[in-house]
């Protein structure tokens, strides 16, 4: 039996509407999700894997240094007056080396290598890196703080060692060129033959102090970041590839072959989160994104703040802070003991980096207000000093990331060392870094063309197919049954009643109105 032409058109239009409904709301999201699962995994053939192994553009690495303008007074116990100098801008290139895949457990191992190049054009106007700054002597203070904490009975010997190693310093401050203290290094004189300096230098060499490089003739060179520059990090990191389960992509499962740390207490020793360079897709804003920092030996869990956009792509902004270890049960295990936590907003780096320093947000943002009363010259601002990530939730791509961390040290006060007896004992800032990532136009456009433009086209097309298909089906049905509809309109069961005007009873004209005789008037 052949369908009438109008019903054929209606069937075709209805099919278009049904296809638009099924494809637009069922098939396409399923296909997209399946494709993303393949693309976001760290398999060898994906673009994500290539970018994960070697980021094809430089990150912004900015350093701000606090100049102690009243060092002589601080030596006598006065409140430090600080002047922030910066940024000193460095181009940071990141790559993963010695990469090995392990099919049996869907993991991948690697080591890190970072390379820094000073960029004077992107630094603050006039800064060359040759400026001389006055800051607390990080190495000298570090030695004193470590001995005071671990072997206080040896403080007297350390005092003699300092006089030999640092040539009888007049105070605990360092006057040094910026690039020397950051990368090039400053000489630590270990050529002295006296017992105290020699014994101390032998211990330094044995311990392998962070930032220290052995030079010829028993000299050491110390810098903050120099040992990281163009050097392969010794730690072997193991993460999930996400081929078996894409939601596990980038998850840290071991460092140096160990599946947990031994430096904290309880759950703080667990590896939670990704390595910070890749995140799983399809994360709802109600969930936190987690990343494990091998530099700080801890997990950060940024939380959702608000909707944002970057170069036309919708993103979710997540923010983070250091935390309040004393009052947050989840973070209390980062304290050496439950009741010996640092002030809010500070984290002790000694267990992780072997360095007696504290990290915080810059300018003590979101920290114990008492910290701001110990120094002058700080102005915390959430827009300039906060940690934030603009995260594309479908692919899990960080579009913009700003990791800002400040390094602080305690001005140790002790009567056993002449240079330290009048110090305040307060925690003061040394410098802070702003490590930033912003996807450039090339990679944003690539993301748009591979994902968002097809998604928008399908979004428009599905509504067009459903709307016009439904309309076409209705019109076809109406045209097919139009004659029948018209007949129903005119014949049907409805009867037409004949209206017969009512005939009124004839009346004589006299009945209509009786003549009235005029009233007689007597004159």
Swiss-Prot record:
Its main location: membrane. Residues 33-458 are extracellular. GO terms for cellular component: cytoplasm; plasma membrane. InterPro entries: CD36_fam. It is a multi-pass membrane protein. It is found in: Cell membrane. Residues 1-11, 480-523 are cytoplasmic. Keywords: Cell membrane, Disulfide bond, Glycoprotein, Membrane, Olfaction, Receptor, Sensory transduction, Transmembrane, Transmembrane helix. Glycans are attached at residues 229, 440. GO terms for biological process: sensory perception of smell. It holds the Pfam family CD36. Signal peptide: none annotated. Plays an olfactory role that is not restricted to pheromone sensitivity. Belongs to the CD36 family. This is Sensory neuron membrane protein 1. The lineage of its organism: Eukaryota, Metazoa, Ecdysozoa, Arthropoda, Hexapoda.
């Amino acid at each position: 039996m052949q369908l009438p032409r109008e019903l054929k058109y209606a069937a075709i239009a209805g099919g278009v509407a049904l296809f638009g409904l099924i494809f637009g709301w069922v098939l396409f999201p399923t296909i997209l999700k399946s494709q993303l699962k393949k693309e976001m995994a760290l398999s060898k053939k994906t673009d994500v894997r290539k970018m994960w192994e070697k980021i094809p553009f430089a990150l912004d690495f900015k350093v701000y240094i606090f100049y102690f303008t009243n060092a002589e007074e601080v030596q006598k116990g006065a409140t430090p007056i600080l002047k922030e100098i910066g940024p000193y801008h460095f181009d940071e290139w990141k790559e993963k080396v010695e990469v090995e895949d392990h099919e049996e457990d869907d993991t991948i191992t690697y080591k890190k290598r970072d390379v820094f190049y000073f960029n004077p054009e992107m630094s603050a106007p006039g800064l060359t890196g040759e400026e001389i700054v006055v800051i607390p002597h990080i190495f000298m203070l570090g030695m004193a703080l470590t001995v005071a904490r671990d072997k206080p009975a040896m403080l007297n010997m350390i005092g003699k060692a300092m006089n030999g190693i640092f040539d009888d310093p007049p105070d605990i401050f360092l006057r040094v060129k910026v690039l020397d203290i950051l990368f090039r290094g400053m000489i630590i004189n270990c050529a002295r033959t006296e017992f105290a300096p020699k014994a101390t230098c032998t211990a330094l060499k044995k311990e392998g102090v962070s930032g220290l490089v052995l030079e010829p003739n028993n000299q050491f060179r110390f810098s903050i970041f120099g040992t990281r520059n163009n050097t392969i990090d010794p730690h072997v990191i193991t993460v999930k590839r996400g081929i078996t389960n894409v939601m596990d992509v980038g998850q840290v499962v071991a460092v140096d072959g160990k599946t947990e740390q031994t430096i904290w207490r309880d759950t703080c020793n667990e590896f939670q989160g990704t390595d910070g360079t890749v995140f799983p897709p399809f994360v709802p804003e109600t969930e936190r994104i987690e990343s494990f920092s091998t530099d700080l030996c801890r997990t950060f869990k940024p939380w959702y703040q608000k909707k944002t956009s970057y170069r036309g792509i919708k993103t979710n902004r997540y923010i983070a802070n250091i935390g309040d270890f004393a009052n947050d049960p989840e973070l209390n295990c980062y304290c050496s003991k439950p009741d010996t936590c640092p002030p809010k907003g500070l984290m002790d780096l000694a267990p992780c980096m072997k360095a007696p320093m504290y990290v915080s947000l810059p300018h003590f943002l979101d920290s114990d207000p008492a910290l701001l009363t110990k120094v002058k010259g700080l102005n915390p601002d959430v827009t300039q000093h906060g940690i934030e990530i603009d995260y594309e939730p479908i692919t899990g791509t960080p579009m913009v990331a700003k990791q800002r961390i400040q390094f602080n040290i305690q001005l140790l006060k002790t009567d056993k060392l002449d240079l330290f007896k009048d110090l305040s004992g307060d925690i003061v800032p040394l410098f802070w870094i702003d490590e930033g990532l912003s996807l450039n136009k090339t990679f944003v456009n690539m993301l748009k063309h591979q994902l968002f433009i097809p998604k928008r086209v399908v979004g428009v097309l599905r509504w067009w197919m459903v709307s016009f298909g439904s309309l076409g089906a209705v019109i076809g049905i109406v045209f097919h049954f139009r004659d029948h509809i018209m007949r129903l309109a005119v014949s049907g069961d409805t009867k037409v009643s004949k209206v017969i005007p009512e005939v009124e009873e004839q009346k004589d004209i006299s009945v209509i109105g009786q003549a009235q005789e005029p009233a007689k008037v007597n004159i």
